[in-house]
Amino acid sequence: MQTILGSGGAIGSELAKALYQNHTKEIRLVSRNPKRVNPTDELYSADLSNPTEIDAAIAGSEVVYITIGFEYKLKVWREKWPAFIRSVIESCTNHKAKLVFFDNVYMYAKEEIPHMTEESKMSPPSEKGKVRKQLVDLILEAVKAKKISALIARSADFYGPGIGTSMLQETVFKNLQKDKAAQWLGGVNFKHSFTFTPDAAQATAMLGNTPNAYNQVWHLPTHSDTLTGKEWTELFAHQMNKKAKVSPIPKFMLKILGWFIPILGEFYEMTYQYEQPYFFDSSKFMKRFPEFKITGYQEGVQQIVAQAYQNTDVKE
């Protein structure tokens, strides 16, 4: 049994598809209100802030994937994330399950953002980044103590069909849909890597089912030909037959907008990632899995646009 904790988000449902297609039909989907992705999925409703329910959800699992996303709020992250990770580690230890943690880049030092690798220094300038570093430390300490086998599958900012949590899609795609100018945090001429969610899910499933991939950090496959904010806007506009207009969002505006749209206020401390080049190096993964085909940015944008016009409902 392979279990996904947080199965309803941008990555969880894609991961369920990838596991079913290529690795196993024994998949358990865990969230408050799990929905079947594949015909044979086992649905398990649980409150993932409750250690007892976490333990019951993990029981009988060979591999446990963490793809849950708690509310994007520092106070919630501080309260929920460390306790959740401790509970998962304890349950994986008790049930002899391997752990795969789907991670982001918030824990990296500011100066590492222009070229991030698995060896980049973890010295986060943001409070949310400090929470993320704490989670990584907890997992790596458990590995070092030989309590569990675990791996960290790390993604850049992501984009993909039908998701409502991508900064790229929220600020560029959705504005162009409304015939408005796209918006971009920071300078529009800085290059910025984005990981395509179906690629991230396929790669995470591969890692979880590769025994010698454990007890280390992996950057998930991300196209090396990065684009600037202006180029991302032009790419979306071309696919949508829209005019390519983009305006930068000044940092101070996030503070003001945060009074009305709280998530923008929460993102204020992360703007350093958009004020310089942002390059996510996944060459380690590609050397280990050279057969993996990374989706090109043009194809990724085509899929997003096609999906949006086929189905106007966007998953949150």
Question: Where are these predicted regions, by residue range?
Answer:
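NAD(P)H-binding glycine-rich loop region in Rossmannoid oxidoreductase-like domains
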Residues: 35-36, 41-95
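Conserved beta-loop-beta element that borders a ligand/cofactor-binding pocket
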Residues: 104, 137-162
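Short, polar loop motifs at secondary-structure junctions
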Residues: 29-36, 102
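Mid/C-terminal beta-alpha module of Rossmann-like enzyme folds, strongest
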Residues: 2, 203-267, 282, 287, ...
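Substrate-positioning beta->alpha
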Residues: 164-171, 185-208, 215-219
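Short-chain dehydrogenase/reductase
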Residues: 78-82, 114, 125-137, 166-170, ...
